[in-house]
Every structure is written in structure tokens, then in C-alpha cells.
Amino acid sequence: MNKNNENNIKLTFHPAEFGEKMPIPLAEQSVKAGFPSPAQDYMEGEIDLNDILVRHREATFYVRISGDSMKDAGIFDGDLAVVDRQIEPSNGNFVIAFVDGEFTIKQFKMDESGTFGWLIPWNSDFSPIRVDETNRFMVWGVVTYVIHRIAE
């Protein structure tokens, strides 16, 4: 079954806020999967996630993802995407795009001819969306990070 129309996709946009810093302890060493260690013994300082996630303050937004067209890329319903509107989209970037009155998150691929592009879903239940001069289309921003909750 191919879902060509993604009217069920709903994105919620939030500007990146930079009020009071919220430093979080930073472990001195990287953590190997499966190797337990008393982490508190290895704290080296603090970090603020905005310093890592946000390169262009005025152009960065957080977008809540709704829908499952990108699940095979590890982007799930309810995830939070960090989107930078100042980055020029490149072939292969994951983007928030505006197509014919709808926002969507997809991988952007330009055709070799350069005359049209594709918005590629990462779920075989969905079809790629061809974009060219006949569409109302714009890349709204480039997805730089995705925050995915793994525990409640």
C-alpha cells in the first residue's frame, strides 16, 4: 500500500529559546555499550545542549514530528527535530519541506539533470514526492539533529 498523500503528517514548530543556561554534567570518557562504570567518577565539566545543537540561533527551530514516513531513518512519531533555516540544503540532506500547502520531513535528492528533485520517505508504505516548477515547493530548513526519547 502506497500512501501518496500525507495529510496525517503534522509538524509543530518551536523557536529555539536561549534564556538561562542549563548546564548538564559531561562525562570525561565516552561510554562503551555494555561496559558498566560508576559514571560520577568521570565527570569532567558541564555542557549546555544549545551550544551543541544550535549553530545559528536566529534561524534554528525545534519541530515536533508526527507520522511514520521516516521511521526507517530512525525518525519516529513524537521525535523532536532540530532544524536550521540558514543552512543551504544539499543533496541527501534530511529537510523540512513545504509542498503544495503541506509541511513534511523527507530526505532531499536532486535529479542528475538538476531540473527536478525528490522528497524521499524512509518507509516503504510511502511514495517519493517529485518536486519541480509545477509544485509550490520550498525547503523550509535542514534537519541537523533528531532527539528521540528512549525511556519515560
Q: Whereabouts are the PLM-identified features?
A:
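Short, acidic/hydrophobic/Gly-rich beta-strand patch recurrent on exposed beta strands
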Residues: Y62-S66, I96-F98, F108, W118-W122
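Short polar/acidic secondary-structure junctions
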Residues: V54, Q86-E88, M110
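Structural motif
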Residues: G78-D79, N93
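Short, positionally conserved secondary-structure boundary motifs
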Residues: M1-K71, E102-F103, F137-W140, Y145-E152
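Hydrophobic beta-strand signal
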Residues: V82-V83, I96
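Glycine- and charge-enriched low-complexity intrinsically disordered segments
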Residues: M110-E152
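Short, compositionally biased
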Residues: N91-T115
